[in-house]
Amino acid sequence: MSAATDGTPDATPDATGGGRPVTTPGGRPDGDPAPAAAPRASADERILHASPLRKLLSRPELGSVVGALAVLLVFAFAADGFLRASSLSTVLYASSTIGIMAVPVALLMIGGEFDLSAGVLVTSSALVSSMFSYQMTANVWVGAGVSLLVTLAIGAFNGFVLTRTGLPSFIVTLGTFLMLTGMNLGFTKLIDGTVSTKTIADMEGFPSAHAVFASTLTVGGVDFKITIVWWLGLVALASWVLLRTRTGNWIFAVGGNKDAARAVGVPVTRTRIGLYTGVALGAWISGQHLLFSYDAVQSGEGVGNELIYIIAAVIGGCLITGGYGSAVGSAVGALLFGMTSKGIVFAEWNPDWFKFFLGAMLLLATLLNAWVRKRAEAAK
């Protein structure tokens, strides 16, 4: 028999979302008559009955979607072959190489931090995998496993130093960036004698590793790189974490106000370290793709890519101040980057203009995102 029929109290959510005992017709547990339910606040009614337009305006990625459609239209008219399936495949590949890193970087920015070492960490991951496999004459999967451990340790190191010292993430990750840049070049020259690693194409395990990280899939007669699958998978996973798990709530809470989040029991330190470890995981995936695509790695690669990852996340709706953004937005930001970089080539424009367009997109997307956010807050 349910509580409603035998007169015992039943716990239902109150207006704040928690559970408290309320009475059935039999009365409250202490025998006092039940008070009349307070009317729901009008603000709650507005939220519950929000129009589709209001819900749309509240989405962080709205600005980037509008920008992506505009860029698509521009290059559709400016470049004759831009909308061909083969051209779109090229655009998606360029987008995926940025998007794999833009997703964890976006989560980190939602958590109120950013990582200047993300670009060179990709190269570090590839170098460790390549040099360990070659020097130890080991299966390349062993090298990839060692690389995973080292890369995750570097990410955790960033988070640990940040949380223990209280230093800004700019200082901590700038230091890591400089150290990794020097180590990448120094160790490669020390071990291999040049600025690039030896080829590992003929080593055991290379074909299977190439299939996982750098193969090509044919769909409908069009070739697509497997990095597109990795990218979309990470977007789906990150969106699920942000929107459907307690960890996602922690990320938004930490990015919004660390002290308030800590006061209500959010594991702030663990969340921040976990976010940096997530960036390291993305760097490992990108690093293995880099290695198994070209068989060897240049030690100076990756410098400057960290800004591209951050730009993709910001264009996608993430705020530098934290607490706002989405994984889908970062994917759209990466797509914008891919369309612009390849669209300029297809349109036969001077590629020197690429940085100009990238900066203009960043500025316009930031302004549009700020306007959308203000409209969304005003509508609540």
What are these regions (language model features)?
Residues 2-73, 77, 256, 263-270, ...:
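Cytosolic-side transmembrane-helix boundaries in multi-pass membrane proteins
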Residues 53-61, 85-91, 137-142, 214-229, ...:
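Interfacial loop-to-helix junctions that mark the boundaries of transmembrane helices
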Residues 64-76, 105, 180-185, 230-240, ...:
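Hydrophobic core segments of alpha-helical transmembrane domains in multi-pass membrane transport
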Residues 71-136, 160-167, 313-328, 360:
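Single transmembrane alpha-helix segments in multi-pass membrane proteins
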Residues 137-177, 332-333:
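Alpha-helical transmembrane segments within multi-pass membrane transporters and channels
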Residues 138-148, 152-158, 219-297:
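Helix-loop-helix "hairpin" substructures at the membrane interface of multi-pass membrane proteins
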Residues 170-245, 271-274, 294-302, 377-380:
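Transmembrane helix-bundle core of multi-pass membrane transporters
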Residues 283-284, 293-359:
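Transmembrane alpha-helical segments in multi-pass inner-membrane proteins
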